Amino acid sequence: KTLGISTAASPAKPILDKSGYKKGDSTIGVLSLKELLLTAKTLGINKYGMDKNKSFGTGTLNAVNYLLDKWGYQKNGIAGENFIKRLHTEIENKVK
């Protein structure tokens, strides 16, 4: 008897992006992503800061995973096209 407690595993959260920028990447695109993340921090959307450079490090990873979790997705550390579009929409909605 389970006493009303479900023993079924909770369904896995969906994945927002399977490919995109990830920890260890170092490109001008990562710099652009980080500028969006820092703007989001200024607006109170994201709580993590990071260095202003083109390297995807721990600070960027923390910010990406924080937002993925906040939006109901798996924290897989990947910021792809869907992540960037969603982040832009969040920023746009804050500044309207």
What are these regions (language model features)?
Residues 17-89:
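Short acidic, glycine/serine/threonine-rich helix-capping segments at coil-helix boundaries
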